[in-house]
């Protein structure tokens, strides 16, 4: 697994510039939509946007902490034991995050349940730790985990969860904001389509695959149109020259 996870991030070329860095991680080489990693939580916990956001934030915290630890120890880790040690560090951090959510956000913990522990097997976490954090200083490693790669995974979870929530739960957007923000934020509940009874399939496992398929198809269409626009623009520039 470690060799596959380590090579999962190699296919993305190094972007030049801050905007291209964000664009690459959030869209062009998105962890879930392009590299097709971490699909288990993307399909299992995204029955609501709140669940997707909670899982995304938990993954972001794991990435930030593990990136910092692995980067700080990068000169002390022998290549022979690097992968097992990184997996152990990731497992320890995930355990701490799991216990923290259970203690302070128990309602959210009851929803996410086992899937928090499965962050350990997330190839995106191990692959990023091996390809970037083991070769770079602490601060860039922390920012790398927080800024784009985890954000790209989080927005996919929120979008899939939001679509399934609107279609399957009587078009109510974030019916349980209290899971993340507390009882005082119940007012965030919004009814998007009054009178809509919801589609049961959307909140069932097959619905997760269907929604993911539509999101992937939408991305392919956008990418194709962007490519066609670049080709037309390049052709016009050649003609003008």
UniProtKB/Swiss-Prot annotation:
- The organism named in the record is Stutzerimonas stutzeri (Pseudomonas stutzeri)
Give compartment(s). Cell inner membrane
What Enzyme Commission number(s) apply to this enzyme?
Answer: 7.-.-.-
Which membrane topology describes this protein? Multi-pass membrane protein
Disulfide-bond pairs as recorded: none
Similarity field: Belongs to the NqrDE/RnfAE family.
Principal subcellular localisation of the protein: membrane
What is this protein's record name? Ion-translocating oxidoreductase complex subunit E
């Amino acid at each position: 697994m470690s060799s596959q996870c380590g090579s999962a991030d190699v296919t993305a070329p190094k972007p030049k510039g801050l905007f291209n860095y964000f664009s690459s991680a959030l869209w062009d080489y998105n962890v879930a939509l392009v590299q097709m990693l971490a699909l288990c939580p993307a399909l299992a916990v995204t029955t609501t946007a709140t669940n997707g956001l909670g899982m995304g934030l938990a993954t972001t915290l794991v990435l930030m902490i593990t990136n910092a630890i692995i980067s700080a120890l990068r000169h002390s880790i022998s290549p022979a034991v690097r992968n097992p040690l990184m997996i152990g560090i990731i497992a320890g951090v995930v355990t701490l995050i799991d216990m923290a959510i259970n203690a302070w956000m128990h309602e959210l913990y009851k929803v996410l349940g086992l899937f928090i522990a499965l962050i350990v097997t997330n190839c995106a976490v191990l692959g990023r730790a091996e390809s970037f954090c083991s070769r770079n200083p602490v601060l860039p490693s922390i920012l790398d985990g927080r800024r784009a790669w985890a954000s790209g995974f989080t927005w996919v979870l929120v979008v899939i969860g939001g679509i399934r929530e609107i279609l399957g739960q009587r078009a109510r957007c974030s019916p349980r904001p209290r899971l993340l923000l507390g009882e005082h934020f119940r007012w965030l509940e919004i009814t998007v389509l009054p009178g809509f009874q919801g589609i049961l399939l959307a909140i069932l496992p097959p619905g997760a695959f269907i929604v993911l398929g539509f999101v992937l198809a939408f991305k392919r269409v956008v990418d194709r149109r962007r490519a066609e626009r670049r080709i037309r623009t390049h052709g016009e520039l050649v003609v003008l020259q």
